[in-house]
Amino acid sequence: MRLFLLRHGIAEPGTSHLRDFDRALTPEGRAELDSIGRALRRLDVAPRLVLTSPLVRARQTAELVAPVLGATVELADELSSGATFDQFLSLVRRFTAEDALMLVGHEPDFSEAAAEWIGANGDALVVKKAGLIRIDLDDRHPGAHGRLRWLLTPRQLRLIGAGAELPIDSDDERGEA
């Protein structure tokens, strides 16, 4: 399975009058995700399903990207801020029949889970807002082992979305950039 981890876009700052759950994307965050959606299409990111954290900024991210990919969106409480690797693993294992799956959520949850999947230290990866990780999971051990294929920053994705030459081959089986 190709597993895509997309961190939510740029959101409003937290204030004493706004619950963390309710923080929405900023206009800048929405505009950036439009470009990133184009990049995902150019990279042949084509999951049928996008699972998202129920937090507003993650839901909005999923709702902006999914139509570009031709995917449907489902809420997954397991992706709420503070998710553990075991929660990620349990969630992904429910969808092992999928060729590709996208999760939209939060940091440091994504970088910690990705590091666990690829056998790296927990602080080995950092996913910026609107950044993307692709991990190819081992079909013999559904969800348990994976190989890092991409760690793309929002800047790289914006450039790809704007038509820049692809820095990676989306079908490269060796995972080399």
What do these predicted ranges mean?
Residues 2-77, 82-83, 110, 123-127, ...:
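Active-site-proximal alpha-helix that buttresses catalytic centers in soluble enzyme cores
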Residues 43-45, 94-99:
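Glycine-rich phosphate-binding loop signature in dinucleotide/nucleotide-binding domains
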Residues 3, 97-105:
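Generic beta-sheet signal
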Residues 80-97:
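Short phosphate-binding loop-to-helix
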Residues 118-147, 151-156:
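Domain-level recognition of soluble alpha/beta enzyme cores
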Residues 113:
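Residues that scaffold the ATP/ADP-binding catalytic core of kinase and kinase-like folds
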